A protein has these predicted regions:
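C-terminal regulatory/oligomerization modules of transcriptional regulators
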Residues: 1-5, 24-38, 43, 52-55, ...
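Conserved N-terminal beta-strand and adjoining loop/helix that marks the start
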Residues: 7-11
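Short helix-coil-helix linker/hinge
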Residues: 12-17
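Pre-recognition alpha-helix immediately N-terminal to the DNA-recognition helix
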Residues: 19-21
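Residues within the DNA-recognition helix of helix-turn-helix
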Residues: 49
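Short, Lys/Arg-rich nucleic-acid/phosphate-binding segment
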Residues: 63-69
Length: 115
């Protein structure tokens, strides 16, 4: 996943309504009417949110007759989680090193000051 795609995913996930839509879709695919009924926003607003989620690759749309059914595509979220996980491990390692240095500094200070 390139930087631009990652930006789209994080931007899409930044909105509480879009996160709510993904939670609703975790129960299974739904049509736009069903999704709209679950939120206190207009159908055009839901359509804009769905468009943003679609650009980020977080949902897939299937048109059947006159209805459009939406389902979750977890792949981009998993890739974003892997990115976050990488940097979580990176910073944890560096914070552990700082903690070790501070502990050694405290010990050295105590040794210098005596009992």
């Amino acid at each position: 996943m390139d930087s631009h795609d990652l930006d789209l995913v994080f931007s899409a996930l930044a909105d509480p309504i879009r996160r709510g839509i993904l939670v609703k879709l975790s129960d299974g695919e739904q049509n736009v009417r069903q999704i709209t009924a679950a939120f206190d926003v207009s159908q055009p607003a839901i359509s804009r949110h769905l468009r943003t989620l679609g650009k980020a690759g977080l949902i897939r749309k299937d048109k059947r007759g006159r209805e459009q059914f939406i389902r979750v595509n977890a792949d981009p979220a998993e890739e974003a989680a892997a990115w976050v996980g990488h940097y979580t491990r990176f910073w944890k390692h560096h914070f552990d090193q700082v903690e070790d240095i501070l502990a050694q500094t405290r010990k050295d200070t105590e040794d210098d000051n005596g009992p």
